[in-house]
């Protein structure tokens, strides 16, 4: 037993040194989740917007064949029928082309992969034409049989780790990742995506799988494909969906030796702060002091595709596109702060939490419509195209690894800080104006506020801020303004 445990620990250590590198192209940071977009549309977005605006990566919806469900809800993508690359987003040829085109403009691809389970009862027909019999645990498209699954049981007690990992999540047939054949099939699937040029994976429902089994799977994966610009010996970036708000049997610390985790406490906490339930002044120690995993183990976000719908963690405290002023402020803070690896959500609008993406006919996904101001229509929200968000991606790229300096707060809901001498940001979440002379840390000069506008040649389409020889500037953010944040950086100097 001791030897077995030692082998598992060594496997964890071997994986640990490789899976935390995002594999971003130099000078870029931040990824965006283009939720339910088609592959052809993502390829064009990489070339036309993500690449030119400094985004480092794109998380895409599950790429493999899923069950076709009545009314085509978004969650059908999380009910696998096979590992064939055939979904409403496109086929394998389109996906491969997308990855190649995105890599060519410096935007890496991260695939949402689902291998905790297969489709639940009722999922008998797939998007690639495969059939299945979930009631008998038969999925010929892989193929999987009943021998490859855990015994049928429901998860009802999250204080029982065995039940959480060995029973079925909402009726989804629970694969046994300790089974060598299942491991072979999962590794084959992930390696195929690596061959096509992806940079990493978001592992769905990782909390419901045993860490030792995941260590074996991750440890068997190929190195990234150098034909797509990755350095020799690079490993896939692994981010695991582990919802840990405390008080349950399973902890995120069981997974942080394997890769990064989705830090849901970040989403919950940032929502509370910018909704006014906590004061901005307390953000001075934002990070592990708030119960988050280590920075290089934390994928951070304001909201994700689950909790913006009330699923997962956070509940009513989660900020979404439906509360735009505070959402933009929270997103700007996330991108201005050095903690974690930030992911921007890009949604489609919804009124029903089961509602799928916009379609042309009830089945085929519609392409987003782009407006002259960069925003989207046609049912797509495209938060990643909001100026207050994409300009903060450029801010993050500009400040690099510079530390937070010159922290200021008013003892309430007005704060500011610099990132070294390269960027400065201020926030006002009070119900009265912010009008203060603040230390920006920046060289003297006139700067364009990249929240209210953008630098255009030698002019600015928004507010300007004049920094004196002492680094101080008069900062003004009215409580009734559309944006409760102001940001300047050295690349926005006029």
UniProtKB/Swiss-Prot annotation:
CDD domains: AmyAc_bac_euk_AmyA. It is an enzyme of class 3 (hydrolase). Changing residue 138 to T: In strain: JP-75, KN-7, KN-15, KN-17, KN-21 and KN-23. Pfam families: Alpha-amylase (PF00128), Alpha-amylase_C (PF02806). Chloride binds at residues 202, 304, 343. Changing residue 476 to Y: In strain: Berkeley, JP-1, JP-5, JP-15, JP-35, JP-55, JP-65, JP-84, KN-12, KN-22 and KN-27. Binds 1 Ca(2+) ion per subunit. Binds 1 Cl(-) ion per subunit. Disulfide bonds join 46-102, 153-167, 376-382, 448-460. One of its GO terms (cellular component) is extracellular region. One of its GO terms (biological process) is carbohydrate metabolic process. The active site is at residues 204, 241. Changing residue 181 to N: In strain: Canton-S. Keywords: Calcium, Carbohydrate metabolism, Chloride, Disulfide bond, Glycosidase, Hydrolase, Metal-binding, Pyrrolidone carboxylic acid, Signal. Its cofactor is Ca(2+); chloride. Ca(2+) binds at residues 116, 165, 174, 208. PANTHER family: ALPHA-AMYLASE. This is Alpha-amylase A. It comes from Drosophila melanogaster. The gene is Amy-p.
């Amino acid at each position: 037993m001791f030897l077995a445990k030692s082998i598992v620990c060594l496997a964890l250590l071997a994986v640990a040194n490789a899976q935390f590198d995002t594999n971003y192209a130099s000078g870029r940071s931040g990824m965006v989740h283009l939720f339910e977009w088609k592959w052809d549309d993502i390829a064009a977005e990489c070339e036309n917007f993500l690449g030119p605006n400094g985004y480092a990566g794109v998380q895409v919806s599950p790429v493999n064949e899923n069950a076709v469900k009545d009314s085509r809800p978004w969650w059908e993508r999380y009910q696998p029928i096979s590992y064939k690359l055939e979904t409403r987003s496109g086929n394998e040829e389109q996906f491969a082309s997308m990855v190649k085109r995105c890599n060519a403009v410096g935007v890496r691809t991260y695939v949402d992969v689902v291998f905790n389970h297969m489709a639940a009862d009722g999922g008998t027909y797939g998007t690639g034409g495969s059939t299945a019999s979930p009631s008998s645990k038969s999925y010929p498209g892989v193929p999987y049989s009943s021998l490859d699954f855990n015994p049928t049981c429901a998860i009802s007690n999250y204080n029982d780790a065995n039940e959480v990992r060995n029973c079925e999540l909402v009726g989804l047939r629970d694969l046994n990742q300790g089974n060598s054949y299942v491991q072979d099939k999962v590794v084959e699937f992930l390696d195929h995506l690596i061959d096509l040029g992806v940079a990493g994976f978001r592992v769905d429902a990782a909390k419901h799988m045993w860490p030792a089994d995941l260590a074996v799977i991750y440890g068997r994966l190929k190195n990234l494909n150098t034909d797509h610009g990755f350095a020799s010996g690079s490993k896939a970036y692994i981010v695991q969906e582990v919802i840990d708000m405390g008080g349950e049997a399973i902890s995120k610390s069981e997974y942080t030796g394997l890769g990064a985790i989705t830090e849901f406490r970040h989403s919950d906490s940032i929502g509370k702060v910018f909704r006014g339930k906590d004061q901005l002044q307390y953000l001075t120690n934002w990070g592990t002091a708030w119960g988050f995993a280590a920075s290089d183990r934390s994928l951070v976000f304001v909201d994700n595709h689950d909790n913006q719908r009330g699923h997962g963690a956070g509940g009513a405290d989660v900020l979404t596109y439906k509360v735009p002023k505070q959402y933009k402020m929270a997103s700007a803070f996330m991108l201005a702060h050095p903690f974690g690896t930030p992911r921007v959500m890009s949604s489609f609008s919804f009124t029903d939490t089961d509602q799928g993406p916009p379609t042309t006919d009830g089945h085929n996904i519609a392409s987003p419509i782009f407006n002259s101001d960069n925003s989207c229509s046609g049912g797509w929200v495209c938060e990643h195209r909001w100026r207050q968000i994409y300009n903060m991606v450029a801010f993050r790229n500009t400040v690099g690894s510079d530390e937070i300096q010159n922290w200021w707060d008013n003892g309430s809901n007005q704060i500011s800080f610099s990132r070294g001498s390269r960027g400065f940001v201020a926030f006002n979440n009070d119900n009265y104006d912010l009008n203060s002379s603040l230390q920006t840390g920046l060289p003297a000069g006139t700067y364009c506020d990249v929240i209210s506008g953008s630098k255009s040649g030698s002019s600015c389409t928004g507010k300007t801020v004049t920094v004196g020889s002492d680094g101080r500037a008069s900062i003004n953010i009215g409580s009734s303004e559309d944006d409760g944040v102001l940001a300047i950086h050295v690349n926005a100097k006029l």
